[in-house]
């Protein structure tokens, strides 16, 4: 309750901030550096309220990222699940959910049927309802998701640098004049994550660095794949970024030993997400929708994942998993028990 009282002064501003984009809010600052930094926090297309929530979370010390990244988080969850007696079958991609007489009865993997009492679909919901069943599913909330979803996409660039950058900040923002172009997008600035002080990210004396270029470039990369220029286009982008960064950081010139470029097609292949998107834009004037974890037409079918509660993110994905299991327990007259690992 005391926390709610502290938030009261902010409440009158929420409607106005929700109707303004993060870009528009950032443009209100005179200092170029502040404007560019604010544009990179949540993405320019989000509403300004999303920016406020993110900044408040960080300022309160209540936000961060999983140690080792999302993959390490998934590995830890998998280990805990297996320690509890659960079984995981790796390197097997589900082709479709089996439905008989209006009930989900299992999944098909490479022409092998695995029967189950219930199925919880955790792949991107938007992708699942279109591709994981004999026919695309059509329910009111699914149609709403198809219509309203504004996918977040990026092209992610990673560099392995044979230089110790531990004397530099963990995050740096560089502006470019003139800008450079890739996949039809103009890049005026670049936010660089510097992992020099993180153990295990690079050999001793070396540095791993990453940067995300936001923008819907799915169709461009898809076309490049079709034309056969995909790998060359990725190489050209990496070389452009390396050249531009070397002009800002002379100590990395000729020191980049390895690079990797992940496009929306990479995310699509690796994670099975809709157009390779990993979150949903909540733009100005948008009212975030919370979608059901169950199907109205198919029994024993449950959904979980970041797409169910825009804008998404790892915490949302975990929460929706918990919700799906609570529905499963309700439907099977099972008492839901949840406790943190000891």
Label every PLM stretch briefly.
Residues 95-204:
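Mid-domain catalytic core of redox enzymes
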Residues 120, 159, 211, 245, ...:
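Hydrophobic, well-ordered secondary-structure elements that form the walls
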Residues 1-50:
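Rossmann-like flavin
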Residues 56-110:
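Helical element adjacent to the flavin cofactor pocket in flavoenzyme catalytic cores
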Residues 306-332:
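A conserved FAD-binding loop/helix module that cradles the flavin
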Residues 93, 99, 329-342:
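Active-site-proximal substrate-binding core of FAD-dependent oxidoreductases
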Residues 32-45, 251-310:
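A glycine-rich dinucleotide-binding beta-alpha-beta segment and adjacent secondary-structure elements
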Residues 162-265:
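C-terminal segments that line or cap access tunnels to active or ligand-binding sites in enzymes
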């Amino acid at each position: 309750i005391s926390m709610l009282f502290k938030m009261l002064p902010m409440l009158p501003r929420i409607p106005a901030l929700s109707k303004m984009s993060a870009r528009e809010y950032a443009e209100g600052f005179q200092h170029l550096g502040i404007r560019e930094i604010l544009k990179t926090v949540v993405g320019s297309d989000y509403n300004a309220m999303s920016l406020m929530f993110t900044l408040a979370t960080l300022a309160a010390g209540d936000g961060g990222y999983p140690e080792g990244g999302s993959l390490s988080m998934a590995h830890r969850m998998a280990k805990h699940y297996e320690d509890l007696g659960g079984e995981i079958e790796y390197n097997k991609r589900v082709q479709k959910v089996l439905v008989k007489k209006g009930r989900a009865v299992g999944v098909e993997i490479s022409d092998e049927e695995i029967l189950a009492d219930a199925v919880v679909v955790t792949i991107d919901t938007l992708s699942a309802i279109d591709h994981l069943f004999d026919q695309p599913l059509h329910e009111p909330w699914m149609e709403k998701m198809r219509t309203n979803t504004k996918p977040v996409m990026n092209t992610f660039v990673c560099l392995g640098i044979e230089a110790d950058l531990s004397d530099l900040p963990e995050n740096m923002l560089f502006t470019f004049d003139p800008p450079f172009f890739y996949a039809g997008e103009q890049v005026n600035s670049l936010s660089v994550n510097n992992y020099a002080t993180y153990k295990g990210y690079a050999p001793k004396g070396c540095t791993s660095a990453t940067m995300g270029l936001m923008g819907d470039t799915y169709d461009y990369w898809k076309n490049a794949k079709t034309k056969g220029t995909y790998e060359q286009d990725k190489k050209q982008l990496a070389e452009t970024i390396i050249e531009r960064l070397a002009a800002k950081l002379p100590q990395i010139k000729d020191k980049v030993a390895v690079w990797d470029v992940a496009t929306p097609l990479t995310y699509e292949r690796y994670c099975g997400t809709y157009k390779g998107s990993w979150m949903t834009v909540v733009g100005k004037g948008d009212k975030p929708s919370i979608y059901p974890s169950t199907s109205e037409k198919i029994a024993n079918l449950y959904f979980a994942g970041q797409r169910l509660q825009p804008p998404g993110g790892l915490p949302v994905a975990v929460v929706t998993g918990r919700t799906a299991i609570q529905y499963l327990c309700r439907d099977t007259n099972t008492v839901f028990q949840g406790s943190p690992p000891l």
